[in-house]
UniProtKB/Swiss-Prot annotation:
Compartments in which it is found: Peroxisome
Species the sequence originates in: Arabidopsis thaliana (Mouse-ear cress)
Name listed for the protein in its UniProt record: Diphosphomevalonate decarboxylase MVD2, peroxisomal
Entry-linked NCBIfam families: mevDPdecarb
Motif Peroxisomal targeting signal PTS2: chain residues: 40-48
The organism's taxonomic lineage, starting at the top: Eukaryota, Viridiplantae, Streptophyta, Embryophyta, Tracheophyta
């Protein structure tokens, strides 16, 4: 086999997810076992995703990986754990067309090339590591003919990045903390698919696409060691919220969903403040967006928009339907207009058909926006240009898929090197 020069590869696409009941804190740092259950919404991979190509060849002399075009080291324990677990479950692979035959036992000796690309900022609080590790595990499982269901694969992805386990499903997903020491029961399960509640529209305000000062990994460790609020949250608060959130999702009860999502996001950031030294993930712009949503929800009498923030300043806003999303976007663009030379289609990305519905497909549209009547005196004037880098409009989406179109592959099919 060593003299052969074939390259066998698979390309896959995996979504990212946003937690509505947060995961913050591990009880086991090595196996990545959380101190509480969490629930997330998978975001439409058409707008936010990781694409990964994995290749195997007898010509490769070592495992190599490229992330967003730059070669990175695979020596870290998280990558090694994922690679070891997947290789240990590999099956026989045969490609009659190319005359390739890989026996189960051969996988230990063969080296891999991996290329991965996020279509959104890495490490800025948009769960890029979640999509990345989920995509790595999913694509390798397809390459190596691993016969496991997504929940079993989620336990492997979890060892790369905790929230990655939730990106192996579409729709609404629960990561069960489990109780076993080996982590075998700490897996993700789908609560409902993406079609279950398809009225929802999600707008993300990318407040900063810079890398954050405190990584989630070190932030969590410090919170577990120093925050009494985290202990109270994990034991007393989250178990009840998980049950309530499951019920809200099942019944498409937006009022309960909003109340739980917003309070859980705020408590997560309170835990960060209760950490010693305190961790600040949100900034003034984040706080202004919260004020905007809170005032609007109160003025309407029933919740129209839920907000949630992960470990970063970006706001994820979930509107109850398309009509509300149009009004929300108009309000956001009134308070956070683009700089004067910005093309609207690069300021609102993803599903930007919403711009037309909001009457904002021309640059002059923003200048003609009226302040939302119920909140115009309370948020500040329309002078916040540049506070938001851009907006992403999306919705709940599907889980991972294999991309069969070779033009989408990130590695050259002849050499197995990045294109």
């Amino acid at each position: 086999m060593a003299t052969e020069k074939w390259v066998f590869m698979v390309t896959a696409q995996t979504p990212t997810n946003i937690a509505v009941i947060k995961y913050w804190g591990k009880r086991d740092e090595v196996r990545i076992l959380p101190v509480n259950d969490s629930i997330s919404v998978t975001l439409d991979p058409d707008h936010l995703c990781t694409v990964t190509t994995v290749a195997v060849s007898p010509a490769f002399d070592r495992d190599r990986m490229w992330l967003n075009g730059k070669e990175i080291s695979l020596s870290g324990s998280r990558y090694q754990n994922c690679l070891r677990e997947i290789r240990g479950r590999a099956g026989d692979v045969e490609d009659m067309e190319k005359g390739i035959k890989i026996r189960k036992k051969d996988w230990e000796k063969l080296n891999l090339h991996i290329a991965s690309h996020n279509n959104f900022p890495t490490a800025a609080g948009l769960a890029s590591s979640a999509a990345g590790f989920a995509c790595l595990v999913f694509s390798l499982a397809k390459l190596m003919n691993v016969d496991e269901d997504p929940s079993h694969l989620s336990a492997i992805a979890r060892q790369g990045s905790g929230s990655a386990c939730r990106s192996l499903f579409g729709g609404f997903v629960k990561w069960t903390m489990g109780s076993k020491e080996d982590g075998s029961d700490s897996v993700a399960v789908q609560l409902a698919d993406e079609k279950h509640w398809d009225d929802l529209v999600i707008i993300i305000a990318v407040v900063s696409s810079r890398q954050k000062e405190t990584s989630s990994t070190s932030g969590m460790r410090e919170s577990v060691e120093t925050s009494l609020l985290l202990q109270h949250r994990a034991k007393e608060v989250v178990p009840k919220r998980i049950l309530q959130m499951e019920e809200a999702i099942k019944n498409r009860d937006f009022a309960s969903f909003t109340q739980l999502t917003c309070t859980d996001s705020n408590q997560f950031h309170a835990v960060c403040l209760d950490t010693s030294p305190p961790i600040f993930y949100m900034n003034d712009t984040s706080h202004r967006i919260i004020s905007l949503v809170e005032k609007w929800n109160r003025s309407e009498g029933t919740p129209q928009v839920a907000y949630t923030f992960d470990a970063g300043p970006n706001a994820v806003l979930i509107a109850r339907n398309r009509k509300v999303a149009v009004q929300l976007l108009q309000g956001l663009l009134y308070y956070f207009p683009p700089k004067s030379d910005t093309d609207m289609k690069s300021y609102v990305v993803g599903d930007n058909s919403i711009l037309k519905e909001a009457g904002l497909d021309g640059a002059s549209g923003v200048e003609n926006l009226q302040p939302p009547p119920e909140i115009k005196d309370n948020i500040g004037s329309q002078d916040q240009k540049g506070e938001v880098s851009y907006f992403i409009c999306t919705r709940p989406g599907k889980g991972p898929i294999v991309l069969h179109d070779q033009t989408q592959a990130l590695l050259d099919p002849e050499t197995g090197l990045p294109k």
